[in-house]
UniProtKB/Swiss-Prot annotation:
This is UPF0182 protein MAV_4137. It is a multi-pass membrane protein. NCBIfam families: PRK00068.1, PRK12438.1. Disulfide bonds: none annotated. It is found in: Cell membrane. Keywords: Cell membrane, Membrane, Transmembrane, Transmembrane helix. Belongs to the UPF0182 family. Residues 903-941 are annotated as: Disordered. One of its GO terms (cellular component) is plasma membrane. The chain crosses the membrane at residues 18-38, 63-83, 113-133, 175-195, 210-230, 254-274, 287-307. It comes from Mycobacterium avium (strain 104). Residues 929-939 have a biased composition (Pro residues). It comes from the Bacteria. Signal peptide: none annotated.
Length: 993
């Protein structure tokens, strides 16, 4: 029976077609409109920053890749369909029960839609996916050599970093395109009758056979190419159960030959498949494909498994030693841990020290950090917030400056930003929120080695930071009492002010000043932003675009927006850097610094790879997670890398948002490639001013990755490495409230890199022995301009207490626990332990220092800011304890040891009501003794007391006597009871008339 006439589809009316077109237009506008608006806004924003070339380069690259990939994949699929249609049988037998006939009629009635629409849809999807790989393509086009060859194939590492990923991408797209063309060709031949399944055997036309066989042969050829490329990827492969990365004995001696054998078999199979073009018998290509499948199972999987089990496992350490050595060398190269960077020195760790030796370590003892930046933020808020809408982050930053005597000191620093979430009531009105409350005001720095007065009780007026302030004062002038002069303390850009969904401020003169700035005793003073940053929104087009961008009609109707108005948005410093340098991974820590009288945010940027041969693959999220990151939710991105360089230092001006990128690593091939992709965007290292260099610090995230790798890759001997017996561990944070690794600490101490007593700003970490709590090493990374980036590892033999053991010894010492029990008053006051610092002192000793904070009440209320109340130390097995560093050092080493330590003076003015006096500091407390009792203040001159006050004064004297007696006897319970009597008596005295 002949083919039935083609069934006609019902025609749409003109009105229906118009309605459908309108509906499709609305849908397209809804889908594309927001993207077009975002693209236009980004174009404006990048232009305002001076990085429009970055935006245009990325956009053009994505578009070109989209076109090429779409045309390639769509074109191949179209060719498969077109050839199948053109070679279809002229006459196709059919009957009324043939289900294919209905599909054939449908396709023929919409032939243009199917033949063009399907390839276009597939091409669009392929292009959309491909454009996301623009980074890989740009690196292929601009990548260079590393100058290092891999140990197996002798290829420069630039091949693995820049070329191999592109070849893999191209191969994947060709494979997908040919496979889809095969599917399309198969379906087309089936629908048009080239393939018929009726009867027992069915029928296959000659044209269908030739086309399908050709496509299958191409797939097999592509598989042969894949086997060839697989050889190179073995060098970044990790076989399960091995303690190293890269091709091992089994991979080199079994898997690598297997890949070559499989490639040869694939070529033979491809020839067998192509033979079916001229031969009608399809059994030969079928046998070839089955052979390829069986070979991949036997040769590709079975043979390596046999070699692994029989040859390698019984002698694994010896068999793998050569390849372990390769991994050690490559990992050190990839993570910047080579011998020209890392220096190892032996250090006893438990040497005895005299008071004079400790006193001579002035660079260390004079800079012992008492302020924990994760604890003192409430004190900054309490004393320096000023207004409800100003805010300090929960975790402050550490930087260094020269003090007034020219000595290097570390400071806890913070910018006083505006927090939009703290605005209340009418302050949240759109006009107030975005045109009045636009900026923060001030830079606050506190010397980290001292506090303002001694507090013997959390209710006393002492123990809080000394504040050095750069701020706009009540007369409108800049008060510059900070560690460095600052011309402009207003903060329009920062991580706090940007932490909101509506991150924008509208600035610029439109009549009178509108922006809240400061207050005098009689009035509020406003300000108008004068910086260069900001996108103009004075015209109606810009106002309309931003109204759509932020879904806010006030852009159109508010009269506060004038011809001179500008909008500041995308104000997070790290996000700004990531936008203008999309190839960078930024450090999770951003810190403010005064550089050349300007307040800037400093951000560390990393270039990374994930396929460095033989280098260990590391998760940034897990490697950088420590107790601070977990507590403050600042985890690094979940990104796996096998190569990392701190290649860029970036600054963002806190006033006008200017982003500047500086080349930090002049040897990094990845950075060199990106500097060719985006010429002129990264300034050379020589442009880093000396003032900026003084505030660059070794980045935390990089250091945490490196210390985790040094735990393994400090081992030189491959057999020892395989046994893991000499590995180290990153210590857990000993604080009982912590749940992760101990963070590294920035400190100013004696110069470990130069091995002398000069002051050095460094990032440090202790390292434990593998699965034990004893110290194995001490790591210091220098941030000094002259020795920046040099890592010194002090290796410690013997059983020296690690952080956990030191913390346990300090917190369980009888004198310490008894004294803190009295201060805590049965949990009425909260005791918090600060960061446990590990400091090399003397001639081979290690000093542990742990500040103790207390706050009134058992909660974390903002008003209950913590005060430094004690300093605890441990040296070898001895505990030092007291209200000051000097007292604790004296208790440990004897008189004179703390001569260089900061001398904290007693708080002036006595104690507030219901508190023991603050003007009588307790001396150091040695283990096994309790602190002496502080006497109440004695009025100056002749004073006549009322009978009631005189009686209470006798109670005070009796309580003091009881406390002294208990102290002499070592009766801690009696001592605590006497102190409580004393506290009650003082309260009664102050309330008695």
């Amino acid at each position: 029976m002949g083919m039935r006439p083609t069934a006609r589809m019902p025609k749409l009316t003109r009105r229906s077609r118009i309605l459908i077109l309108i509906a499709l237009g609305v849908i397209a506008l809804l889908l594309a409109g927001p993207r077009l608006i975002d693209a236009y806004v980004d174009w404006l924003w990048f232009g305002e920053l001076g990085y429009r070339s970055v935006f245009s380069t990325v956009l053009v690259t994505r578009f070109v890749v989209f076109l090429i990939a779409g045309l390639l994949v769509g074109g191949i699929v179209f060719a498969g369909l077109a050839v199948a249609y053109r070679t279809r049988p002229v006459f196709v037998p059919s009957n009324d029960n043939d289900p294919v006939a209905r599909y054939r009629a449908l396709v023929l009635s919409r032939l243009r839609l199917v033949s063009i629409g399907v390839p276009v849809a597939i091409g669009l999807l392929a292009g959309i996916i491909a454009q996301s790989y623009w980074v890989r393509i740009q690196l292929f086009l601009h990548g260079g050599d590393f100058g290092i060859k891999d140990p197996q194939f002798g290829k420069d590492l630039g091949f693995y970093a820049f070329e191999l990923p592109f070849y893999r991408l191209l191969l994947s797209y060709l494979f997908v395109a040919v496979f889809l063309a095969f599917v399309a060709n198969l379906l087309a031949h089936y629908i048009f009758g080239g393939i018929r399944l009726s009867g027992r055997t069915g029928a296959l036309s000659r044209s269908a056979r030739i086309q399908l066989v050709t496509l299958v042969g191409l797939l097999v050829l592509l598989k042969a190419v894949a086997y060839w490329l697989d050889r190179y990827e073995l060098l970044s492969h990790t076989r399960g159960g091995k303690p190293f990365t890269g091709a091992g004995y089994t991979d080199i001696n079994a898997v690598l030959p297997a890949k070559l054998i499989l490639m040869a078999i694939a070529l033979i199979c491809a020839a067998a498949v192509f033979s079916a073009i001229t031969m009608r018998d399809l059994r030969i290509p079928a046998i070839g494909l089955v052979l390829l499948l069986l070979s991949s199972l036997i040769v590709g999987a079975g043979w390596p498994l046999i070699v692994e089990q029989i040859s390698v496992k019984p002698n694994a350490a010896q068999k793998e030693s050569e390849y372990i050595s390769r991994s050690i060398t490559a990992t050190r190269q990839a993570y910047g841990l080579t011998s020209d960077v890392v220096t190892y020195r032996n250090y006893t760790g438990d040497a005895q020290a005299t008071a004079q030796q400790v006193a001579d370590d002035r660079a260390t003892t004079s800079n012992i950090r008492l302020l924990d930046p994760t604890i003192v933020s409430p004190a900054f808020t309490q004393f320096q917030q000023g207004k409800n809408f100003y805010y300090f982050p929960d975790q402050l930053s550490i930087d260094r400056y020269l003090d007034r005597n020219g000595a290097l000191r570390d400071y806890v620093v913070a910018a006083r930003e505006l927090n939009p979430d703290r605005l209340i009531d009418n302050q949240r009105d759109w006009i107030n929120r975005h045109t009045v409350y636009t900026h923060g005001n001030g830079f606050i720095a506190s010397p980290a080695n001292t506090v303002r007065g001694i507090a013997n009780d959390p209710n006393q007026n002492g123990g809080y930071p000394e504040f050095l302030v750069n701020v706009v004062g009540a007369n409108g002038n800049v008060v510059s009492d900070g560690p460095a002069p600052l011309d402009q303390p207003r903060v329009y850009f920062g991580p706090v002010i940007s932490n909101t969904s509506a991150d924008y401020a509208i600035v610029g003169r439109n009549g009178a000043d509108r922006e809240y700035d400061y207050e005098t005793s009689t009035e509020t003073k406003n300000y108008t932003y004068t910086g260069l940053g900001g996108v103009p929104i004075g015209d109606w087009l810009s106002r309309s675009v931003f109204a759509a961008k932020f879904a806010e009609r006030n852009f159109l109707f508010s009269n506060v927006i004038g011809s001179n108005s500008k909008i500041l948005f995308n104000r997070d410093p790290a996000r700004r850097v990531e936008a203008v340098a999309p190839w960078l991974t930024t450090d999770s820590s951003v810190y403010p610094a005064i550089v050349n009288k300007r307040l800037v945010w400093i951000i560390d940027g990393y270039t990374t790879l994930d396929n460095y041969p033989y280098s260990e693959l590391t998760s940034l999220e897990s490697a950088t997670a420590d107790s601070n990151e977990v507590a403050f939710n600042k985890l690094a991105p979940d990104k796996r890398v096998s190569y990392i360089r701190n290649s860029v230092k970036a600054t963002v001006d806190a006033y006008d948002g200017t982003v500047t990128l500086y080349q930090q690593d002049e040897q990094d091939p990845v950075l060199k490639a990106w500097m060719q992709v985006f010429p002129g965007t990264v300034k050379p290292k020589s442009d880093i001013s000396p003032e900026l260099a003084e505030h660059l610090r070794y980045p935390e995230d990089l250091f945490k990755v490196q210390r985790m790798l040094l735990a393994k890759y400090h081992v030189n001997d491959p057999v020892t490495f395989f046994s893991t017996s000499d590995f180290w561990d990153v210590p857990l944070d000993p604080n009982p409230t912590a749940s992760s690794y101990q963070p590294p600490y920035y400190i100013v101490a004696k110069n470990i890199a130069k091995n002398d007593n000069s002051s050095s700003y460094q990032l440090t970490s202790a390292m434990n022995r593998f699965k034990r709590d004893y110290l194995a090493a001490y790591i210091s990374a220098s941030s000094d301009p002259a020795t920046y980036g040099r890592i010194t590892v002090l290796t410690i033999p013997g059983q020296v207490n690690g952080p956990k053991l030191a913390n346990n010894a300090i917190t369980t010492d009888p004198a310490v626990s008894q004294d803190l029990g009295v201060i805590g008053r049965d949990n009425q006051n909260r005791i918090r332990w600060g960061n446990l610092l590990t400091l090399p002192v003397g001639q081979g000793g290690l000093l542990y220092v742990e500040p103790v904070y207390a706050s009134p009440g058992a909660s974390d209320a903002a008003s209950s800011y913590p005060r430094l109340i004690r300093v605890a130390m441990m040296y070898n097995d001895k505990i030092g304890y007291g209200p000051t560093v000097r007292d604790a050092l004296t208790g440990l080493f004897g008189p004179g040891a703390g001569a260089a330590a900061t001398n904290i003076q007693p708080t002036e003015g006595g104690a507030p009501a219901a508190s023991p006096p603050a003007n009588a500091p307790a001396p150091a407390v040695t283990p096994g003794s309790a602190p002496p009792v502080a006497a109440p203040p004695v009025p100056d001159g002749s004073v006549t007391l009322s009978p009631a006050k005189a009686a209470v004064l006798q109670e005070i004297q009796a309580a003091i006597g009881a406390a002294k007696d208990a102290q002499k006897k070592g009766d801690f319970a009696g001592y605590g009871a006497a102190l409580q009597r004393l506290d009650d008596a003082i309260t009664k005295y102050n309330n008695t008339k």
